[in-house]
Regions:
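Phosphate- and other anionic-substrate recognition elements at nucleic-acid/protein interfaces
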Residues: 1-189
Length: 189
């Protein structure tokens, strides 16, 4: 994970990819040199739902179009997405890969640099444990950001974790410390 240049007006759009539901979260820096979660604010968060009645190619088109429109509307400096992981179910992994492709193509068409991060990196940065459960990541996000217990959709909270983890992994002492640990333990990151 390399460093990224950030100003107080920088925005990162985090995306949790899926073939049926795509989570998104836009965060913005409020300091010239943001180094902690408190230096960022949540600007928008939500989900994009595709129709399960549509064919997979039609859903991919829907996802691509929705992300393309979000990028136009939100104008982020960076877009962050989870790297593909090896799932137990080959069909599910293939559909996720197709959805990621549609999303990354939208990033590319809008010339928005793509930050990729593994699920284990997100969990380690946000919850302090690369094997944390989704609930533990959600609770850690609550503690870091101080938002109320009202439930975000799971895909939206995952996108929020992706955006924050991508920012923190590349900025300031926390990001540098994570990068150093990852370099020393390449099989664990």
């Amino acid at each position: 994970l390399g460093q990224i240049p950030v100003t107080e007006k920088s925005k990162i759009l985090g995306i949790d990819p899926g073939s049926r539901v795509v989570g998104f979260a836009l965060i913005g820096a409020i300091k010239v040199k943001p180094v902690s979660p408190k230096d960022w604010v949540v600007l928008d968060v939500g989900v994009i739902r595709t129709s399960t009645e549509l064919s997979m190619p039609a859903r991919l088109g829907q996802i691509h179009g929705a992300i393309f429109d979000l990028l136009s509307e939100m104008a982020p400096q960076y877009a962050a997405i989870e790297k593909a992981f090896h799932g137990v179910n080959a069909g599910t992994a293939l559909k996720l890969g197709e959805a990621r492709g549609a999303i990354i193509a939208a990033f590319s068409r809008r010339s928005v640099p793509t930050l990729e991060i593994t699920p284990a990196e997100v969990k380690r940065i946000i919850a302090g444990n690369g094997a944390a459960s989704k609930e533990q990541v959600y609770q850690a996000l609550q503690a870091l950001l101080g938002f109320e217990r009202g439930r975000l959709p799971l895909d939206a909270s995952d996108a929020l974790a992706i955006a924050y983890a991508s920012a923190l992994a590349r900025l300031g002492p926390m990001g540098q410390a994570f990068t150093n640990v990852a370099k020393k333990n390449p099989k664990r990151s």
